[in-house]
């Protein structure tokens, strides 16, 4: 079956990018890219390893083939070195030197301003670092949502923009080394291939493959320009996303590197899930129609921004500086898209404190000890009051009923 699919996609992708921009073609392109990049052949796309290098080559060759007849398109790579410690959990300048590479596609429309579109293509390899998988066997972490989904969206968006909007130049960057610490985006911003002052704004796609039935979509960085909120809300009138907007320009993804260069930057995100950083983040769980919906939403944002002459930059409050420090956890996955009162739980890790005392997915934490929990920040404040071995009562809301759970932190 896989042979037939591969042959079909081979003939399909012989068409040039601009020949067919229909929704059908674009969604098929997205599916093809996600399926390829999240295949076992790439062994989890770890930075500096054979699978990661192979993934970068695939993206480069894909763009090269598609844009081979377009004189205003340039495809190139940006290599950089990084150090790997013998201990996989520690990055060290004294470790083994390895090569990584960003993959670039630049559409030159001879305009003064450039819009940067970014997505990291690296992932966790076999899970020797950064994995939340607790099994004993080493397994490939394919990272279909994180972040084959973002790469596919960005590449397909370049296809659409080539014909639909020539008001700007466009630079797509598939970043390497994000999982190890934003290596690729940081290197680009320190060694830019275009003048940073010419960048109008940056759009980052990281984990956009799990749009749920409520159409919940998080957009981080809306405070990085005074123009973002009105622009996004106006465009969303015709898109019906349930938006969760966050102002901070700092976050655990590549938009942060651009924000630190005084560039307005957004991060699009469909939410965390139980498969995050686990081998189970596979392509059969991706919402391909959802990625397409986000793509056209972003295309409309870019188009609507045409009427804004001065896209200003604003410094934002760094939410991470206000984050309380804590030494214990419940062993649960927060629902970062939840906009109600409390902290809703999106997943529970087996064997951890929450699981041991009967906390379930879907429960909403509303109080921890003496601390009322209204959001993620107050939840972390509650955790900061305790140490390992401390006993407390956690009040949750389950199916509309308040329940007190007495527990001891492990």
Task: Give the role of each language-model region.
Residues 88, 93, 97-99, 125, ...:
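Acidic/histidine-rich catalytic neighborhood of metal-dependent amide-processing enzymes
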């Amino acid at each position: 079956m896989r042979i037939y699919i591969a042959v079909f996609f081979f003939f399909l992708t012989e068409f040039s990018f601009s020949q067919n921009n229909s929704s059908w073609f674009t969604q098929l392109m997205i599916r093809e890219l996600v399926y390829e990049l999240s295949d076992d052949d790439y062994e989890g796309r770890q930075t500096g390893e054979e699978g990661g290098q192979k993934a970068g080559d695939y993206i480069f060759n894909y763009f090269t083939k598609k844009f081979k007849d377009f004189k205003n398109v340039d495809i190139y790579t940006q290599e950089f070195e990084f150090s790997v410690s013998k201990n996989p959990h520690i990055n060290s300048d004294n470790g083994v030197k390895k090569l990584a590479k960003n993959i670039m596609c630049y559409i030159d429309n001879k305009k003064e301003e450039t819009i940067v579109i970014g997505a990291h293509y690296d992932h966790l390899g076999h899970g020797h670092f950064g994995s939340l998988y607790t099994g004993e066997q080493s397994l490939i972490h394919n990272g279909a949502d994180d972040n084959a989904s973002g790469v596919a969206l960005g590449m397909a968006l370049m296809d659409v923009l080539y014909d639909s909007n020539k008001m700007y130049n466009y630079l797509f960057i598939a970043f390497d080394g994000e999982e190890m610490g934003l290596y690729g985006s940081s290197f680009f911003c320190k060694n830019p291939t275009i003048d940073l002052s010419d960048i109008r704004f940056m759009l980052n796609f990281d984990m956009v493959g799990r749009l749920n039935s409520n159409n919940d979509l998080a957009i981080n960085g809306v405070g990085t320009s005074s123009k973002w909120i009105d622009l996004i809300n106006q465009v969303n009138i015709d898109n019906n996303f349930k938006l969760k907007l966050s102002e901070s320009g700092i976050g655990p993804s590549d938009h942060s590197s651009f924000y630190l260069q005084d560039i307005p930057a957004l991060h699009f995100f469909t939410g965390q899930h139980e498969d995050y950083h686990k081998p189970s983040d596979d392509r059969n769980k991706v919402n391909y129609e959802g990625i397409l919906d986000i793509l056209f939403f972003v295309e409309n944002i870019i188009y609507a921004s045409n009427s804004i002459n001065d896209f200003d930059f604003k410094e934002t409050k760094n939410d991470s500086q206000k984050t309380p420090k804590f030494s214990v956890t419940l062993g649960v996955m927060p629902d970062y898209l939840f906009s109600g009162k409390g902290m809703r739980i999106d997943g529970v890790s087996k064997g951890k404190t929450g699981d041991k005392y009967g906390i379930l997915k879907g429960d909403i934490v509303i109080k921890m000890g003496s601390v009322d929990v209204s959001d993620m920040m107050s939840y972390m404040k509650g955790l900061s009051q305790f140490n390992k071995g401390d006993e407390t009562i956690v009040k949750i809301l389950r199916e509309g009923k308040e329940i007190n759970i007495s527990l001891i932190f492990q």
